[in-house]
Amino acid sequence: MTMPLSVTVCQKIDQAIAKYPAGREQSAVMAALTIVQSERGWLSPESLRDVAAYLNMPPVAVYEVASFYSMYHLKPVGRYVLTLCTNLPCLLQGADKAARHLQEALNIGWSETTADGMFTLLQGECMGACQEAPVLLTNHHRMCCKMTPPQIDALLAQLRAEAAGKERDE
């Protein structure tokens, strides 16, 4: 069972709602989903119901949005979501090698999470940086370009060190 939406989340959703005309709070559904996922890590059925109630929407309508977009996670994911572009331009520049290396280094397949909950590996569609192929996104925000096995190893080490530092700070 999840907690109700936090005060901070409600304030952020209210800021998103304020961008739309009065009575159009449902227009903020994508922003609300992003905000809730940012706090909770993923969108559980309870989270979807919370968003639906807050925006006065049918829960199925919120689910339809969340299930349509790949940036929303309807099951738990790792602390770091690694999305590798597997479209043709990236494949021609070595995304297949990058994929194999990631899967071997993490000991997981596509759409799986490492046993320690640190990484989830996803296939992605074109990210609009074909000239920088192969491209990998971390947590849907940071774009890493020209990802060779050594660069992948460095990225994984950096993310592990970052996570260890955050755990010490907590």
In which residue ranges do the predicted regions lie?
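Signature of N-terminal electron-transfer/Fe-S-associated modules in redox systems
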Residues: 1-170
